Swiss-Prot record:
One GO BP annotation of this record: fatty acid biosynthetic process
InterPro entries: FAS1-like_DH_region, HadA-like, HotDog_dom_sf, UPF0336/Enoyl-CoA_hydratase
Family stated for the protein in its record: Belongs to the UPF0336 family.
Organism, scientific name: Saccharopolyspora erythraea (strain ATCC 11635 / DSM 40517 / JCM 4748 / NBRC 13426 / NCIMB 8594 / NRRL 2338)
Database matches in CDD domains: R_hydratase_like
MaoC-like domain segment(s): 8-128
Lineage per the UniProt record: Bacteria, Bacillati, Actinomycetota, Actinomycetes, Pseudonocardiales
Name of this protein: UPF0336 protein SACE_6876
Xref: HAMAP family: UPF0336 (MF_00799)
GO molecular function (one): (3R)-hydroxyacyl-[acyl-carrier-protein] dehydratase activity
């Protein structure tokens, strides 16, 4: 079943606050093999001008993917998550994510396109502090395989 095009432009409510801790940053850095002391050593981070350790740039995926739950779990959209693959990811950082941040994410459906029998869902996650300071904009493409109707009646 094709995705509902009327969802283009939809914005979902902010996620609950996510507390960024040093340990979460360290674990993420270890998982992606980023050995920078800025992610592990508060003194190294302070010497570089940061108030505390900073997260690797891709740490934002934790927040953006969690925010995607609002879209994935929206029964009106009709997205069968068992058919979804992650197609693309981009980040635009306004400042580094750092230990002690309390962050919220608002997710938007920016586009839905049908191609070759698949639906391509473009999602934007705006990550801010709980006070509203912009931190990161994450854009993702989710591909729902075999859900779209080919406008020309053929699957390419």
């Amino acid at each position: 079943m094709p995705l509902d095009q009327s969802f283009i432009g939809r914005e979902y409510p902010p996620t609950p606050a996510y507390e960024v801790g040093r340990e979460k940053i360290r674990e993420f850095a270890e998982a992606i093999k980023d050995r920078s002391p800025l992610h592990r050593d508060p003194e190294a981070a302070k010497a570089a001008g940061y108030p505390d350790v900073i997260a690797p740039p891709t740490f934002a995926v934790l927040l953006s993917m969690k925010a995607h739950d609002a879209i994935v779990e929206d029964p009106q959209l009709g997205l069968d998550y068992s058919r979804v693959v992650h197609g693309q990811q981009e980040f635009a950082h306004h400042r580094p994510i750092q230990a002690g941040d309390r962050l919220r994410t608002v997710v938007h459906v920016d586009d839905i396109k049908a191609r070759a029998g698949n639906d391509f869902l473009t999602v934007r996650a705006e990550i801010t502090t709980v006070e509203g300071e912009p931190v990161c904009t994450a854009k993702s493409t989710l591909v729902a395989r075999g859900t779209a109707e080919d406008p020309e009646g053929e699957d390419a």
